[in-house]
Structures are given as C-alpha cells and as structure tokens.
Amino acid sequence: MTSKLKRVAVAQLCSSADLTKNLKVVKELISEAIQKKADVVFLPEASDYLSQNPLHSRYLAQKSPKFIRQLQSSITDLVRDNSRNIDVSIGVHLPPSEQDLLEGNDRVRNVLLYIDHEGKILQEYQKLHLFDVDVPNGPILKESKSVQPGKAIPDIIESPLGKLGSAICYDIRFPEFSLKLRSMGAEILCFPSAFTIKTGEAHWELLGRARAVDTQCYVLMPGQVGMHDLSDPEWEKQSHMSALEKSSRRESWGHSMVIDPWGKIIAHADPSTVGPQLILADLDRELLQEIRNKMPLWNQRRDDLFH
C-alpha cells in the first residue's frame, strides 16, 4: 500500500437485543481491522442493539452509555496490544438527556460516534432524517415513535482517511444533505445503516452510487445483515408482555460496500455470509482529485439559482 492510499475497513454484523453479545462482536471486528492494517473501521447503525418496539428501545438505551465506555476502553487496549492506531465510527443509541425529559421528550437518540485511537469521542452526530414509511408490499415503520431527530449538520472530521462527512441510514435519501457535506469539504461520506430487505433490494446500491457521483466522494456503507434476534426475557418479564405482543425478529439487507467517487463499487460484502464480516478497500486521494479536476462539478454549479 503506497503512501497515497489509506485503508478503510467496513464492518457488517447482525445486532441483537443483547448489548453484551453485540459488544463482543464489535470488539472482534475492530481487532480484525487492526490486524488487516485499516486506518479507520466503520460499523453499522444500531451496533449496540436493535429492539422490539419503542418501549424496549428506551429500556435498552439506558445500557448504551456503559456499552460506549467499554468500547472506548477496548479501543485503547487493542491499539496498545497491537502497537497500531485505529479510529472507529459506530452507530449507537443514547437515552434522552435530562433536558429532553424536562421537555416531556422520552425518545432515544440515534447517533453516530467517531472515536479516535485514544478512545476519545471526537464527534457525536444525531440522525436528522427518521424512517417513517409505509413500504409498498412491505413493513410499516415509524422511527419517530422511539427516536428524536437531530437538529444540526455535523462538522467535517479530519480523519486518517481524509475529510469525512457523517450521516446515518435514511439520510442517504436526501441528496441535499450529502451535497452540503461536500460543500463543507467532505472527501468521504459514510452511511451506517439497517436497511430493510424490501428497501435494500430496491435502492441500497442505487442510493450509494448516486451519492458518490453527486458529490464525487468515496461512499462507505456499513450495514446490518440477516435475521436479528430481538428476544429479551428480562424485559419481557418486567413489561408483562404476552406472546402475541412480542416482536422478536426483524431482518436487514446487508450488502455492505465501498464506492469510489466515479460510482464504482470497489469492495462488497459476501451476500452468502450472514454473520459478522469485514471488507477492506484502499482509498486513493489522487484518484478523487483527478475525477474532480476532470469533471469540475463544484465550479459549474449554478449557485445563483440553487441555494
């Protein structure tokens, strides 16, 4: 790998409602990424847990701060033990803040953390666009029942890979967000996700390649995959749920990938593998600059008409 190339790892996993088990998988994937000489590893949305319903999510979110602290400690341990630095981008949940509760808002926060090799959280981006949809011949989902939307566009991160713009899952459907991140200097965009089978099959690759071409950025797409076990006997007992009320399974699309600024897929998860998986790609900043120089979209934009 030459000096102009930076290696990225994109992880795919199948989260459950058990944060302890999920953390074990996350740590194993980070360890593998270090051993394969990645500079940054990107994990999917909801790497801490997936839940049965809004009440279950609020219950599990109380455990997320401990998950995050243990993850930070694990990163520093892995860096020390392997004598190699790595940064980590990971989608997790946070419980409502004290101010949220004072305002009568008990919904959780869906956030993307960027943690450096010293275990420091450099950025906490809260998902802007929430997945409230009635998919034709598919599920009816209303993320806003359990999640509060963010209120701010995240700053660009000066990562070992280059200038990184952060987004989460459904954000990818709003091109103005990606274009804004590009206008702020982004060279790389990440979209950690938990796409449904129906929407993933129809739009996952299409959206990723479109955002890469729109922005002339590398696009990183770590996804949840497979059938998730959302059973939680402890919570079900506490909440006195009947068997009919339980919703202990959901399925995610997977197909994690890395796309270059020309819209070419340069790394793709093995679709036959449902378990945890890591894909690698070497990002070439000279290629990015060449594409931007030969097709100077940002110089040709009609900012006098479009704002």
Curated annotation (Swiss-Prot):
InterPro entries linked to this entry = C-N_Hydrolase, C-N_Hydrolase_sf, Nit1/2_C-N_Hydrolase, UPF0012_CS
For the ligand (substrate), the binding residues are R173, T199
What's the main place this protein lives?
cytoplasm
**Which GO CC terms are listed, alphabetically?**
mitochondrion
The catalytic activity, as recorded, is: N-(4-oxoglutaryl)-L-cysteinylglycine + H2O = L-cysteinylglycine + 2-oxoglutarate; N-(4-carboxy-4-oxobutanoyl)-L-ethylglycylglycine + H2O = N-(2-aminobutanoyl)glycine + 2-oxoglutarate
One Pfam match, given by its short name, reads CN_hydrolase
Q: What is the active site of this protein?
A: E45, K127, C169
* Superkingdom per UniProt: Eukaryota
Briefly state the protein's biological role: Catalyzes the hydrolysis of the amide bond in N-(4-oxoglutarate)-L-cysteinylglycine (deaminated glutathione), a metabolite repair reaction to dispose of the harmful deaminated glutathione. Possesses amidase activity toward deaminated ophthalmate in vitro.
What is its quaternary makeup? Homodimer.
Name of this chain's protein? Deaminated glutathione amidase
Q: What are the top taxonomic ranks of the organism?
A: Eukaryota, Fungi, Dikarya, Ascomycota, Saccharomycotina
